[in-house]
Amino acid sequence: MQFKDILYEVKDDYANIAINRPKVLNAFTPVTLQELKAALEVAEKDKEVGIIVLSGAGDRAFCSGGDMNWESSKEFQDHEYEFHIHLTKCSKPII
């Protein structure tokens, strides 16, 4: 699966999902949120994955939060809500 805003990699028994927008301190957009949700779904279905690790690319920030250019949009809020629901219902540990 190809992603634009995140990196997805499986190593040993864990999946690393990294927000890959270091120029904006990994601030997320609706696309980022959609991709994060999709990557969580892939990791959750993968029998080889026991743990999911969320991280941020670069060395300045894990994630600065929502991209201010999108944060007030209904689309952003809907995707953020769906992602948070998926985080809480995921059957695998998330670090």
Task: Kindly label every feature range from the protein language model.
Residues 1-55:
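Conserved CoA-thioester-binding segment of acyl-CoA-metabolizing enzymes
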